């Protein structure tokens, strides 16, 4: 059957890896020339700046740029703690050539979105500025490189610039002071104890952020930002590297640092033989955890032996993680209480080692990974290559090229034995710079308790009282009896989208698209109409737990711990789908007990998280307390009927005739079609239809948006004050121009997000970021009905000014409805959308989603090509018609007009003390409309499993 030509190239490339010759290696041979990283045009300018330039065509007409600076927070003095990060912020605010965040506006105007395509990061040792820009016009690359040149020596540090940026930096600081941030900071300080690193977290100190003078920031910038400590990296779809090198010279060659090159000091982290213990109590923690860390000297990666040792270490970590996963899936896992069982893993390896079978599984996995990298060596993302060169500059990590690395791994991996891997465990002794830390929501473990556990494990090891690892039996084949292949009863070609659609003899519809984006990637997903929305409310809770219970029991006929040892190729994946449809999951009391215990722990964890409490209340409020959006409570979990849950899960994956499966990737039809026919076509069709729903007869989700303005505070106990705001508006799209309206609301979401960030961050300096999201997922998949949903604005801020910022955000949206956006605003969001579309057209994920949307679209009437064409034409019509006037009209039409007449505003705030609450009762009228305290509800969100992209479709 002639499908799409040229697919035999994948087979040839795989044969290319398999025929890759083994090397005769000298262990002392150097990996490569440190001064000549593979693939790059590499050099140094007279002023000390290093450059790396490389041609790479993925994605097409794009370039990944970076300025890497060997300057981080560890260089700060006590009164400068946080200044390195502040400098990074100021870079995008103003330079000699750019003011008032003009850099951000310019980059957005060429389609480089703020955040994803223009960003920076500060660590203890370095600062990295990153840009991802289009280069289809010659001047764009030059302008982008000129911006990096400005960052190198022309950042403006004035009092006005600093004052405007303090709020954004402070909000980033506040956002880091949640449970996760506090635990990470505490662990960092414990690990780095005795070193300057322990007291130089990049985010800095609140008092410095709020009050550091501009002169101090400028002094730090001028002292440390020296060109000899910088490198510029450019990887992209360039005609040639020489032109790019010339651009770098044009923009950087005349730059001069204002002082002599500073010597970057080294701050050693002292080792210690005694084990350090710490018990950290975090009332908002999601659960209890123990972290065991070992400090080791950094190993140079210079010789083949160094590389072999690195592979052995990686194999050790893979094998140990596999054991940990398998322990977590046992009937009595030791992870719900402090137990010796989890701590003997490394000691067991020292005594008994890993088995050859375990290491053969790890070796096969790593060989598969390097084979995939080799096959896709010409399809590596420019951002990945850019990051390699950044690490070469900052940490002297060798860049040796994937061809050489594949040859090395193919030669070395078979030579690394189980005993070689097991030997690595000798480095992980509690006398080798070991730090053990417990983290709990309530104090239970003590340092003495942990010290006794370590002592007991050491004694058991000395007495050789630790039993060997008990291995599970792994089946030779996932499908023991191969099914009889089905037939193709109908075939259609859609050349306009490059897909082939098959109807199989069991009724399953399979659509596939062959691509050459990645030589070793195939994605697939499947859907069927009818899901949880079709159930009565009384069955909802039990049935919604079906995928969770089935996932732990073994929805493919095997435990998850058994399947993890199998390599995933197309045949294996299709076999798992066959098993999904033919396995009858039956709940066992012991297994179900473990699953429900884990679910209860998850609910309790979410009760402790203020942000989950907040999100649950937002959903309750915006969707009329609908059971579909309400969090599951522990009392409801305890009423779950496991048998009903599993029966529902089994019924969802019983009738193949209700499913459409879409496959996208580098498919060789001569290999893929027989597998599709055997494992998808071989799924038996039941004698009577099961859950066979007509799309137009499905129910929408039961929800109603408040008809009146609703403003509410959610007050939650917090260790440190946090504040999150969600401002939400109802939307309704009418059927007459539905395709254009769906695209239009996407553009409006991006417009609102851009303007809110510009207004609240760049103009008022009070937020770090904002997100605008659109929800239309509660509607039934109808061809004719209107769509209703909501559009929400989310940001975090200082609790003291949250109400003020809500009012400012509302005023900005009112202004946009009244005056409309500028042409500059419209041009920027059109450019961002177009660039994202162009990037997506080169990705399998994008095409998978596009085809699924084609099938699920209201215009789909059996012709996928026509559906995709109508959707794309709607997108193009929307782009052509979008202008300041049409955007203004859409804001008035789709949102309430004026927007202040119907909305919800929910604000997460720290819980007040009882005395504060009592006193506020008498003054609540002066607080304005935000006077309602809410009941805090515990919840668990999204307990579910996506299994190889197969799900039952319940709502669009």
From Swiss-Prot:
Annotated Zn(2+) binding lies at 85, 89, 172
- Is the keyword Protease assigned to this protein? yes
GO MF terms listed in the record are: metal ion binding; metalloendopeptidase activity
In its UniProt entry, what is this protein called?
Answer: Zinc protease PQQL-like
Q: Name one GO cellular component term.
A: plastid
Active site location: 88, 165
Cofactor(s) needed for function: Zn(2+)
Known EC number: 3.4.24.-
Q: What are the record keywords, sorted? A: Acetylation, Hydrolase, Metal-binding, Metalloprotease, Protease, Zinc
Q: Which family does the similarity line name?
A: Belongs to the peptidase M16 family.
């Amino acid at each position: 059957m002639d499908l799409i030509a040229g697919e035999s190239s994948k087979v040839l490339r795989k044969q290319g890896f398999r025929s890759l010759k083994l090397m005769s290696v000298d262990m002392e041979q150097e990996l490569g020339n440190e001064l000549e990283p593979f693939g790059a045009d590499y050099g140094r300018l007279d002023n000390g700046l290093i450059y790396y330039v490389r041609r790479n065509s993925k994605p097409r007409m794009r370039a990944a740029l970076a300025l890497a600076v060997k300057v981080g927070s560890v260089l700060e003095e006590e009164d400068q703690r946080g200044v390195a990060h502040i400098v990074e912020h100021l870079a995008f605010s103003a330079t000699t050539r750019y003011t008032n965040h003009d850099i951000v506006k310019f980059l957005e105007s060429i389609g480089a979105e703020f955040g994803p395509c223009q960003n920076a990061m500060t660590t203890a040792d370095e600062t990295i500025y990153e840009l991802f820009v289009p280069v289809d016009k010659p001047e764009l690359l030059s302008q982008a490189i000129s911006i990096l040149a400005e960052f190198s020596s022309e950042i403006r540090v004035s009092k006005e610039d600093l004052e405007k940026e303090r709020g954004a930096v402070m909000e980033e600081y506040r956002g880091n002071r949640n449970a996760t941030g506090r635990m990470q900071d505490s662990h960092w300080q414990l690990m780095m104890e005795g070193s300057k690193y322990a007291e130089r977290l990049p985010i800095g100190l609140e008092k410095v952020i709020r009050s550091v003078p501009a002169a101090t920031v400028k002094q730090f910038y001028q002292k440390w930002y020296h060109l000899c400590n910088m490198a510029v990296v450019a990887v992209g779809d360039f005609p040639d590297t020489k032109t790019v090198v010339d651009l770098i010279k044009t923009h950087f060659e005349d730059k001069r640092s204002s002082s002599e090159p500073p010597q970057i000091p080294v701050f050693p982290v002292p080792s210690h033989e005694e084990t350090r213990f710490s018990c950290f109590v975090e009332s908002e923690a999601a659960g209890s955890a123990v972290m065991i860390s070992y400090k080791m000297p950094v190993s140079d990666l210079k010789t083949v032996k160094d590389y072999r040792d690195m592979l052995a270490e990686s194999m050790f970590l893979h094998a140990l993680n596999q054991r940990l996963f398998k322990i977590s899936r046992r009937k009595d896992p030791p992870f719900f209480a402090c137990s010796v069982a989890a701590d003997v893993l490394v000691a067991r390896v020292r005594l008994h080692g890993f088995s050859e079978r375990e290491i053969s599984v790890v070796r096969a996995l790593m060989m598969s990974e390097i084979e995939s990298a080799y096959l896709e060596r010409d399809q590596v993302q420019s951002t990945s290559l850019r990051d390699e060169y950044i690490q070469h500059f900052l940490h002297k990590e060798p860049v040796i090229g994937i061809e050489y690395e594949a040859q090395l791994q193919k030669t070395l991996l078979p030579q690394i034995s189980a005993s070689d891997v097991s030997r690595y465990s000798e480095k992980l002794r509690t006398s080798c710079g070991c730090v053990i830390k417990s983290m709990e929501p309530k104090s239970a473990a003590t340092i003495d308790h942990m010290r006794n556990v370590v002592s007991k494990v050491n004694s058991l090891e000395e007495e050789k009282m630790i039993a060997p690892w008990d291995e599970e039996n792994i089946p030779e084949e996932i499908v023991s009896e191969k099914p009889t292949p089905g037939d193709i009863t109908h075939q259609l070609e859609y050349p306009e989208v490059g897909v082939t659609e098959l109807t199989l003899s069991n009724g399953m519809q399979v659509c596939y698209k062959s691509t050459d984006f990645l030589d070793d990637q195939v994605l697939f997903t499947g859907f069927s109409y009818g899901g949880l929305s079709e159930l009565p409310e009384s069955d909802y809770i039990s049935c919604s737990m079906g995928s969770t219970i089935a996932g732990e029991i073994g929805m493919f006929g095997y435990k998850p711990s058994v399947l993890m040892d199998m390599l995933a190729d197309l045949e294996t994946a299709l076999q798992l789908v066959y098993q999904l449809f033919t396995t009858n999951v039956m709940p066992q009391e012991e297994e179900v007990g473990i699953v429900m215990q884990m679910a209860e722990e998850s609910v309790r964890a979410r009760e402790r998280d203020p942000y989950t409490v907040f999100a649950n209340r937002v959903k309750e409020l915006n969707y009329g307390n609908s059971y579909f959006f309400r969090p599951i409570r522990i009392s409801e979990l305890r009423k779950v009927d496991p048998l009903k849950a599993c029966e529902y899960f089994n019924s969802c994956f019983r009738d193949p005739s209700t499913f459409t499966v879409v496959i996208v990737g580098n498919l060789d039809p001569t290999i893929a079609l027989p597998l599709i026919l055997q494992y998808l076509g071989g799924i038996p069709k039941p004698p009577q239809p099961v859950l066979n729903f007509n799309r137009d007869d499905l129910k929408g989700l039961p929800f109603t948006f408040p008809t009146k303005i609703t403003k509410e505070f959610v007050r939650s106990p917090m260790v440190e004050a946090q504040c999150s705001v969600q401002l939400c508006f109802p939307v309704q799209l009418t059927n007459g121009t539905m395709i254009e309206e769906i695209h239009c609301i996407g553009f409006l979401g991006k417009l609102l997000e851009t303007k809110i960030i510009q207004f609240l961050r760049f103009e008022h300096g009070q937020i770090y970021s904002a997100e605008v999201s659109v929800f239309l997922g509660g509607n039934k998949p109808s061809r004719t009905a209107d769509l209703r949903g909501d559009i929400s604005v989310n940001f975090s801020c200082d609790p003291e000014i949250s109400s003020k910022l809500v009012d400012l955000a509302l005023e900005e949206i009112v202004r946009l409805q009244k005056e409309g956006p500028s042409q500059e605003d419209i041009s920027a969001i059109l450019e961002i959308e177009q660039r994202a579309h162009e990037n997506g057209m080169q990705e399998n994920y994008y095409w998978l989603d596009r085809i699924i949307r084609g099938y699920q679209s209201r215009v789909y009437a059996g012709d996928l090509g026509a559906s995709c064409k109508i959707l794309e034409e709607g997108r193009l019509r929307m782009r052509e018609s979008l202008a300041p006037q049409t955007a203004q009209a859409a804001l008035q039409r789709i949102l309430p007009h004026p927007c202040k007449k119907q909305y919800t505003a929910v604000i997460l705030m720290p819980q007040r003390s009882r005395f504060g609450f009592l006193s506020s009762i008498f003054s609540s009228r002066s607080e304005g409309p935000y006077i309602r305290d809410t009941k805090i509800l515990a919840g668990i969100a999204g307990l579910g499993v996506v299994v190889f992209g197969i799900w039952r479709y319940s709502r669009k």
